């Protein structure tokens, strides 16, 4: 059972089929837009909900806090403007700074415990609250990396980027692994992290260990497609190529939805 199925199962009495469908639509719309470098179809709705602290049920059903998902939508909108040549470098950097501050506001409050409790409790049960907290943290780190990639002159070797990737890796280490774990529900997170990983990085070693733990399941579905993209990307970069993951997809005529 993946993360989405698990959360849907334990919250099925709290959500009508209509609300579940709307939540799934928002999830696909937002992350699907990042696949294409364009604005989500319902970006205005997410923006209004973000400004009014509206809830879409994304945390309860998909594992990531609504506010972080709304900001990923905003980053996708910013990328669309960049791709269309609608912003000067100065304006683009100003928007990046503004969104980075908005992401800061979604961080846990300072009065919360510093030590992170384990997702699997002493009696072998899953702490659902900690699972969604950690999932949100992972998406937040990935969102920061995605946002940084829009800065003119972006270089994945920059210390700030490498630090973010290491933080993401340490966050993912606490997510249960293997066929019964939740890695296959974090495809987008792994894609964004892997897109900036450098040869010999902690992330690469960690990712390969997670793929090994998944066994045959790691070659299936969105996770398997994501591993193929990263494998090609990393291999080409070893030969000096500096393209991105979208270039790999376009070069192979792939139009995967990796969520």
Enumerate the language-model features and the residues they cover:
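Noncatalytic carbohydrate-binding groove/subsite architecture in carbohydrate-active enzymes
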Residues: 25, 56, 239
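A cross-taxonomic marker for long C-terminal extensions/tails that follow the last structured domain
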Residues: 25, 36, 62-66, 72, ...
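Aromatic- and glycine-enriched pocket-lining scaffold segments that form the walls
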Residues: 3, 10-37, 62
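TPR/TPR-like alpha-solenoid helical repeat scaffolds
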Residues: 16-23, 120-127, 225-234
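Cytosolic regulatory protein-protein interaction regions
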Residues: 9-16, 38-187, 192-211, 215-216
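Intrinsically disordered, low-complexity regulatory regions with latent secondary structure
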Residues: 200, 209-259
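Secondary-structure junction/capping motif
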Residues: 2-5, 238-239
